[in-house]
Regions:
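The short loop immediately C-terminal to the conserved phospho-acceptor aspartate in CheY-like receiver
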Residues: 25, 68-69
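The feature encodes the CheY-like receiver
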Residues: 29, 71-72, 100
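Charged docking surfaces used in two-component/phosphorelay signaling
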Residues: 30-38
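Alpha4 helix (beta4-alpha4-beta5 surface) of REC/receiver domains from two-component response regulators
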Residues: 33, 77, 99-114, 127
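Acidic catalytic/metal-coordinating carboxylates
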Residues: 48-51, 74-78
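Active-site beta3 strand of CheY-like receiver
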Residues: 59-65
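C-terminal output helix
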Residues: 120-130
């Protein structure tokens, strides 16, 4: 039965991929949402870290785009909890206006998949998302 394929090797189309955006900046959320929806991704939005954790559990996204500095719970705490509580790790891209290399190192230690500094080009974000979800 070598001719039979148990599973299609092609990546799933963007339309089937679910992305959770967690950021307290409405302008950044709107820009990311517009860019990602235009590529066919299904978008969910949380405005703070606690809401982000609740939505991640409820919506089971394929990828989370997470701001580092937010009210109620920082992106670091959200990332740490996502890594501790999910049986299958979700892909996470952390975004930040912070220039410090210590923050990037800490995010990497917590298991972030990629790290983008604000301001970033939407093309760079889309490229990162497509690479991580391929």
């Amino acid at each position: 039965m070598a001719k039979e394929k148990a599973k299609d090797d092609k990546p799933a189309p963007a339309a089937s991929k679910r992305i959770l955006l967690v950021d307290d900046d409405a302008e950044i959320i709107d820009a990311m949402r517009y860019a990602l929806e235009s590529k066919g991704f299904q978008i969910f939005i949380a405005r703070d870290g606690n809401q982000g954790l609740a939505m991640a559990e409820r919506e089971d996204p394929d990828l989370v785009i997470l701001d580092m500095m937010m009210p109620r719970r920082s992106g670091f705490l959200v990332l740490e909890k996502l890594r501790r509580t999910r049986p299958v790790p979700v892909r996470v891209v952390m975004i930040t206006a912070n220039e410090g290399s210590r923050h990037k190192a800490y995010a990497e230690m917590l298991g972030v998949d990629d790290y983008l500094r604000k301001p970033f080009a939407m093309d760079k974000l889309i490229e990162t998302v497509q690479r991580l979800l391929a």
